[in-house]
Amino acid sequence: MDGAIHRAAGPELLAECRTLHGCETGDVKITRGYRLPAHRVIHAVGPVWHGGQRREDEALASCYARALELCETHGLASVAFPAISTGIYRFPADRAARIAVSTSVKTLPVAPTIRRIIFCCFSDDSAALHAREMAEFGSPCAE
């Protein structure tokens, strides 16, 4: 995901990222979107899955909560999330979907500028997991 974003945004994004001095697991930073249609890019450092013994759930939840807080700080009305950490970091997809949706729903009251959250799912299975979790919260889901 990171490589695709950087390729599409252009070299200016990497140049700005180098000024951010890294980011801890579970935290996020924000940059301009440059050549992307998005005005901003929120960079999240999701946890590597180690069997759930290293506070991975808390770190993943922190990525979503902190991203929504940054949206509020910057007056952003919408945000799109991939399924953070479910690729090469091997976070279980069902657990990640539950954390993504529940954290987003719980964080929305402190982020009233946000009107739309999009979960960008790159497989039918991931989309089904996110839709199931949204249904648990009574949230609308558009395919």
Regions found by a protein language model. Name each.
Residues 1-74:
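Glycine-/small-residue-enriched capping loops at alpha/beta junctions
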